[in-house]
Regions:
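Secretory targeting and sorting signals
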Residues: 1-7
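Intrinsically disordered, low-complexity Ser/Thr- and acidic-rich flexible linkers and loops
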Residues: 111-115
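Extracellular glycan-recognition/adhesion modules and their associated mucin-like linkers
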Residues: 7-107, 118-124, 131-194
Length: 194
């Protein structure tokens, strides 16, 4: 006689997720000497994250954060301050914001004396795109985000790409320098000394 055990939800192609917070867009603010300035809105053009042509342009793709129970201990779970899960297209909830890399701290010093960071896998072009939402552990690493729980009304939530619990948070948006046929593109990054 044996005990029948069900496969974990993510192995059956399911994640336990539900929408939290408001539908919104990806936007950044620059911060310098105690002042915020320079809002920049982002949209997905042909599934690639790019800045809108006008800094405060109206993105076509609205996004919804989905809090998900982590199907593996490699991923962070929700805390009192942060939700963790997937960032999905509001009107296409099978499409998820997906990075091509994750960030790790290096032994090197950053440009301004703080810690240095690099993306992995080494040599992979860093991009943020829209892909089918996944339940595979490897792809979840590229689709696992954290979002702050706003403590006040009308306060925007902060968004980070988290990946595995051991990975560094990518809390900034950087632009690819090289021009390609598809455009420059933008991605979640971990900038030194920010």
């Amino acid at each position: 006689m044996g005990v029948a055990q069900a496969a974990p939800a993510h192995e059956k192609g399911e994640l336990d997720c539900h929408p939290v917070g408001e539908v919104g867009i990806i936007a950044t603010q620059s911060y310098w000497t105690n002042h915020y300035y320079g809002h920049q809105h982002y949209d997905f053009k042909e599934s690639r994250l790019e800045p809108t042509e006008e800094r405060k342009g109206k993105p076509k793709k609205k996004l919804q954060f989905y809090e998900c129970k982590p199907p593996t201990s490699k991923l962070n779970g929700t805390t009192a301050q942060h939700w963790f899960g997937q960032l999905r297209v509001a009107d296409e909830p099978t499409k998820c914001v997906t990075t091509t890399t994750w960030w790790v701290k290096t032994k090197d010093t950053g440009a301004y004396g703080g810690p240095g960071y690099t993306s992995r896998p080494e040599g992979k072009k860093t991009e943020t795109t829209l892909k089918e939402c996944s339940t595979s552990e490897e792809t979840l690493r590229l689709q696992w985000f954290g979002m702050t729980r706003p403590s006040k009304k009308n306060v925007n939530a902060a968004l980070v790409h988290k990946g595995y619990a051991e990975d560094e948070e990518a809390f900034a948006i950087c632009g690819n320098e090289e021009n390609t046929d598809e455009g420059k593109g933008s991605y979640f990054c971990r900038a030194s000394d920010m």
